[in-house]
UniProtKB/Swiss-Prot annotation:
The keyword rRNA processing applies. This is Ribosomal RNA small subunit methyltransferase H. It is an enzyme of class 2 (transferase). It comes from Phenylobacterium zucineum (strain HLK1). The keyword S-adenosyl-L-methionine applies.
Length: 310
């Protein structure tokens, strides 16, 4: 089965991973299998993870002797494979365009569908959260995860409305948020954009999953193994940047006015390149969703895993 879209920064990720025959690469976010196919084309083997059972159809036709798909979160990769089992790990974060484009998955505020937003098949839905969470918790989700400045206003309005009728559909909630904020008034993005992002992150526990997944990658990688992470918003990127900076031993220099900074364990990663790399203008023109993508990459050293760190 062919892939319905080309993943963001695919060539940059493959180049950074340096796959080759005899090497095992983990595709932690299989999706439609774009990264996996590119990695398999180099002769490497791939173990792919995805919590969404519907993606299994995209594994049809892949070489059984070099490919395995595991229905699990990528944070479980070390539990499934064991420590030191992989030569590379690729993580493409955020909701896939495949999920966004399927109205029945409930991610989009542009198409009507059930208010779901789950990347997997189990757990509370976005409707459960919207209809039962305390207003203060909803406001926190919108503000922290969605970076929505009108978080309290939206949460209070939702709490009043759900007493009369619960929210069940995506467009129903999106239209309500738009009206609660007084319409678009020339806004560049839909008024529900940030609130929907916050709900999606909360429903799927995306940030805690990312933190756990980075630690799992540290455990599963062999020395000289490579970790490549593509993020799509500042919340994800800050977590990845902080993790790699700390694990690479790049702690802030101490001040002469403050106690000396305590040195951590030996660096377990070495940055493959400084900072983050983004998509080319050509890629952004072909796929506007790529605009905010950032790639960070590092190489596993032979230092022990940071057992006392999250």
């Amino acid at each position: 089965m062919t892939t319905p879209h080309v993943p963001v920064l695919m060539q940059e990720v493959v180049d950074a991973l340096a796959p080759a025959p005899g090497r095992t690469i983990i595709d932690g976010t299989f999706g439609a299998g774009g990264y996996t196919r590119a990695i398999l084309a180099t002769g490497a083997s791939v173990v792919a993870f995805d919590r969404d059972p519907t993606v299994r159809r995209f594994a049809e036709g892949l070489p059984a002797d070099r490919f395995r798909l595991v229905e699990a979160r990528f944070s479980e990769m070390d539990e499934v494979l064991g420590e030191g089992a992989a030569d590379g790990v690729a993580l493409d974060l955020g909701v896939s365009s495949m999920q966004l484009d399927q109205a029945e998955r409930g991610f989009s505020f542009m198409q009507d569908g059930p208010l779901d937003m789950r990347m997997g098949a189990s757990g509370p839905t976005a409707a459960d959260l919207v209809n039962t969470a305390e207003p203060a918790e909803l406001a926190r989700i919108f503000f922290v995860y969605g970076e929505e400045r009108e978080s309290r206003r939206i949460a209070r309005a939702i709490a009043r409305r759900r007493e009369e009728q619960p929210f069940t559909r995506t467009l129903e909630l999106a239209d309500f948020i738009e009206k609660a904020l007084g319409g678009r008034r020339g806004a560049k993005i839909h008024p529900a954009t940030r609130a929907f992002q916050g709900l999606r992150i909360a429903v799927n526990e995306e940030l805690s999953e990312l933190e756990a997944g980075l630690a799992a990658a540290e455990r599963v990688l062999k020395p000289e193994g490579r970790l490549c992470v593509v993020t799509f918003h500042s919340l994800e990127d800050r977590i990845v940047k902080s993790f790699l900076s700390v694990r690479a031993g790049r702690t802030p220099a101490g001040s002469r006015h403050a106690p000396p900074v305590r040195q951590g364990p030996a660096p377990s990663f070495q940055l493959l390149f400084n900072g983050a790399r983004g998509p080319s203008e050509t890629e952004v023109a072909a796929n506007p969703r790529a605009r905010s993508a950032k790639l960070r990459a590092a190489v596993r050293t032979d230092a022990p895993v940071w057992r006392d760190a999250a």
